[in-house]
């Protein structure tokens, strides 16, 4: 029988409601861990709940669950107010990736792109992002766009990067939009603002930055803290786009 930690309902209302409305014995260890991770994402996770979820994932991993391998890695990678541990995250991602989990391969791409407990290795990052992109992961696809935009591992080609960002929007699904559209619109906004890979167009930049702000706001409000800087950039980008637009407004005497 699973022994669930007791939390303050005022601090963790979603977790409390989930536990009151469900019999946790009806859930597998992986299912229960996934449900608990999705609760109260806007507040730091309680340490006792973090430890409980880790144990649930470890139980599932012992049974060969590759999704638990990846999700435990994500729990260590993300900063939910407990133990952010890139070493453990990479270990879990590698374990899942070797067993064919494409999301883990994408996550490893991030680790090598940013040097999370491994040396920055753009060749490996490109390799893992390519695997994700071939499997339809739009995050992997726009990260490949970033590599062309910056000349990481591949020859710098802003035009190719811009086309990749456009391709992301062309193939965007309703399911992917809440977590992908914001970052892609931000990149398109910057491309239009500075004429990187396309003609400079302040009006198109403003539209993209506005759309980016809406999606990124929802991401941050849903607990995706790492996108707070992107949200700030989208707001700042609007100001820069408006400044350029105002330069072209004729003076009226």
Question: Can you describe what each PLM-predicted range is?
Answer:
Residues 34-41, 71-78, 82, 107-114, ...:
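Hydrophobic face of amphipathic alpha-helices that form TPR/SEL1-like repeat modules
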Residues 35, 75, 111, 132, ...:
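TPR/TPR-like alpha-solenoid repeats
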Residues 218-253:
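Terminal, low-structured helical/coil segments at or just beyond the last alpha-helical repeat
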Residues 23-28, 39-42, 63-65, 78-80, ...:
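Short helix-capping/linker turns of helical repeat alpha-solenoids
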Residues 7-9, 44-51, 85-86, 121-122, ...:
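Helix-turn-helix repeat elements of alpha-solenoid scaffolds
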Residues 2-44:
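N-terminal alpha-helical interaction modules that lie
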């Amino acid at each position: 029988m699973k022994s669930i930690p007791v939390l303050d309902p005022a601090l963790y209302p979603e977790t409390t409601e989930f536990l009151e409305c469900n019999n946790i014995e009806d859930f597998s260890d992986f299912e229960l861990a996934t449900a608990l991770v999705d609760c109260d994402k806007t507040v730091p996770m309680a340490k006792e709940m973090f430890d409980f979820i880790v144990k649930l994932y470890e139980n599932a991993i012992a049974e060969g669950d590759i999704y638990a391998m990846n999700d435990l890695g994500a729990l260590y990678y993300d900063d939910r107010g407990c133990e952010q541990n890139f070493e453990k995250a990479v270990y879990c991602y590698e374990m899942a990736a070797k067993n064919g989990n494409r999301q883990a391969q994408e996550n490893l791409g991030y680790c090598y792109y940013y040097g999370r407990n491994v040396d920055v290795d753009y060749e490996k990052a490109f390799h893992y992002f390519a695997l994700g992109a071939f499997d339809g992961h739009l995050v992997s696809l726009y990260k490949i766009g970033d590599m062309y935009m910056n000349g990481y591992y591949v020859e710098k080609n802003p035009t190719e990067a811009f086309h990749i960002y456009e391709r992301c929007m062309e193939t965007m699904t309703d399911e992917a939009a809440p977590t992908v559209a914001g970052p892609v619109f931000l990149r398109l906004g910057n491309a239009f603002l500075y004429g990187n890979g396309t003609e400079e167009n302040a009006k198109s930049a403003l539209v993209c930055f506005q759309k980016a702000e809406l999606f990124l706001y929802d991401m941050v409000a849903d607990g995706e803290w790492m996108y707070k800087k992107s949200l700030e950039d989208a707001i700042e980008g609007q100001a820069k786009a408006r400044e350029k637009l105002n330069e072209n407004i004729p003076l009226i005497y």
